[in-house]
């Protein structure tokens, strides 16, 4: 049975989070009574409030009010006063993934998994299904520019969701189709070992019903190995790999847009399909790979080649995924969520492919534990940047780890032979350096999952204050 509409008031603890806000918005649109709380105000909360959802700032037991159900994310600790109050009242306490799973149970669902690229791929799959008049429900881990939100109601039979592997709860999601973009060493604080991460993705794929299928990236060694071990589920492979069922080739960048072809070889029918001269208004081979996963799903669901072509060409992107925030004197400024070495490397490579100028990177390491666990990878992921600035670590509630801070990262990047890497303290340092070293045609790329996005939007305005010309533009 579906969640009864008369279940009563549903209270979200941490409602401002990107995943929680999307679920809350969809439930509200379905007619459920929703409220929530969070530690601080943000744009997600403002959007929910504009829809009539009551959101408390700060966590207090009294915030529960008349709530009959409480939804929490794994970030909510058992010492949270609202969690304690819910337990004392013997209210059902539901994890975020369980509530998402409830929404998925009564639709045909596509779950996008992988260490990197989930949000963009989810958005692309949604865009192609939308173009094909599937009218999907969507719950994403980022703001889809075309919708202005991370959630889309949709009245069709299909649902597209981002499957967050960080706490293992993605295994609860009942999907008919899954995507695995890549598998890297991440979230070891939860899993304990990389082998445990591998095993979770194996279960993710094998949870697909016999009538569904998995779409897996053959360019990633870990995913290729996993695909070879799946013998009781239908698997469609994709990537640049010549052996992929859905292969992209002839990639090039023109005017900040990716151009490529796709060759689809069906193992079921033996039919070969070519899609030539596809255009994606995004930079980077990694985004073409994500688009190829979306193409594989769309083709399998019967969406025509021309609709696929149109859907890709009109794709509006995702907020904080190589998002241009402004320009100054011909210097373009971008904001990106990349905070893992693999993501940073891919973003900087995309920037390098898109400009003939310099690439200037400003990175804010996210969590001391991640910096410690992946320290060697962080020292070598900035090779496509001409100038690197490392900001203080965004701790996200963690305590510092001796020997693994921004200062040590700068020192080791220098030891790895990068000639221009600098330790910075604040935005004013960035303004000083960029105004000195950057020239027209250069890219300035901010990287990180923390507060650095505020710098990315502030920099063009601060640079414009240095002079009184009219060359400034802000997005």
From Swiss-Prot:
Primary site of residence: cytoplasm
One cellular component term from this protein's GO annotations in UniProt: cytoplasm
Biological pathway: Cell wall biogenesis; peptidoglycan biosynthesis
Binding site for ATP: 114-120
Superkingdom classification of source: Bacteria
Record's keyword annotation contains ATP-binding: yes
Compartment(s): Cytoplasm
GO biological process: cell division; cell wall organization; peptidoglycan biosynthetic process; regulation of cell shape
EC number: 6.3.2.8
GO molecular-function terms, A-Z: ATP binding; UDP-N-acetylmuramate-L-alanine ligase activity
Keywords: ATP-binding, Cell cycle, Cell division, Cell shape, Cell wall biogenesis/degradation, Cytoplasm, Ligase, Nucleotide-binding, Peptidoglycan synthesis
Listed NCBIfam families: murC (TIGR01082)
Family: Belongs to the MurCDEF family.
HAMAP family assigned: MurC
PANTHER family reported in the protein's UniProt record: UDP-N-ACETYLMURAMATE--L-ALANINE LIGASE, UDP-N-ACETYLMURAMATE--L-ALANINE LIGASE-RELATED
Role, per record: Cell wall formation.
Protein name as annotated: UDP-N-acetylmuramate--L-alanine ligase
Source organism of the structure: Bartonella bacilliformis (strain ATCC 35685 / KC583 / Herrer 020/F12,63)
């Amino acid at each position: 049975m579906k969640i009864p509409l008369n279940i009563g008031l549903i209270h979200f603890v941490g409602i401002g989070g990107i995943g929680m806000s999307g679920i809350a918005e969809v439930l509200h649109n379905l007619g459920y009574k929703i409220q929530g709380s969070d530690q601080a105000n943000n744009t997600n909360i403002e959007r929910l409030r504009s829809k009539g959802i009551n959101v408390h700032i700060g966590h207090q037991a009294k915030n529960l009010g008349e709530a009959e159900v409480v939804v929490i994310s794994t970030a909510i600790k058992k010492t949270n006063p609202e969690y304690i109050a819910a337990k004392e009242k013997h209210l059902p306490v539901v994890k975020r993934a369980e509530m998402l799973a409830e929404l998925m149970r009564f639709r045909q669902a596509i779950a996008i998994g992988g260490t990197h690229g989930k949000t963009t791929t989810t958005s692309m799959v949604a865009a192609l299904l939308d173009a094909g008049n599937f009218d999907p429900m969507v719950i994403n881990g980022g703001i889809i520019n075309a919708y202005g939100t991370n959630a889309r109601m949709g009245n069709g039979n299909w649902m597209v969701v981002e499957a967050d592997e960080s706490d293992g709860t993605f295994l609860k999601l009942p999907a008919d189709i899954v995507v695995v973009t890549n598998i890297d060493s991440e979230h070891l604080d939860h899993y304990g070992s990389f082998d445990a991460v591998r095993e979770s993705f194996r279960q993710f794929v094998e949870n697909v019903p016999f009538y569904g299928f998995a779409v897996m990236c053959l360019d990633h060694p870990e995913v290729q190995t996993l695909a070879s071990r799946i013998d009781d589920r239908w698997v469609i492979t994709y990537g640049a790999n010549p052996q992929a069922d859905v292969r992209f080739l002839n990639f090039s960048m023109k005017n900040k847009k990716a151009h490529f072809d796709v060759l689809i070889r069906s193992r079921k029918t033996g039919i070969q399909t070519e899609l030539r001269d596809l255009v994606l208004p995004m930079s980077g081979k990694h985004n073409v790979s994500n688009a190829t996963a979306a193409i594989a799903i769309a083709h399998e669901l019967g969406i025509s080649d021309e609709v696929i072509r149109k859907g890709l060409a009109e794709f509006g992107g995702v907020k904080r995924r190589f998002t241009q925030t402004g320009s100054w004197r011909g210097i373009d400024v971008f904001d990106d969520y990349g905070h893992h070495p693999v993501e940073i490397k891919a973003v900087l490579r995309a920037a390098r492919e898109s400009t003939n100028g310099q690439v200037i990177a400003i990175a804010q390491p996210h969590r001391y534990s991640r910096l410690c666990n992946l320290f060697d990878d962080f020292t070598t992921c900035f090779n496509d940047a001409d100038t690197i600035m490392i900001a203080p670590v965004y701790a996200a509630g963690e305590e510092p780890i001796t020997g693994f801070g921004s200062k040590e990262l700068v020192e080791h990047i220098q030891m790895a032979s990068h000639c221009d890497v600098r330790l910075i303290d604040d935005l004013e340092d960035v303004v000083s350096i960029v105004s000195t070293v950057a020239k027209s045609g250069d890219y300035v790329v901010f990287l990180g999952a923390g507060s650095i996005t505020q710098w990315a939007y502030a920099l063009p305005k601060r640079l414009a204050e240095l002079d009184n010309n009219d060359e400034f533009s802000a997005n």
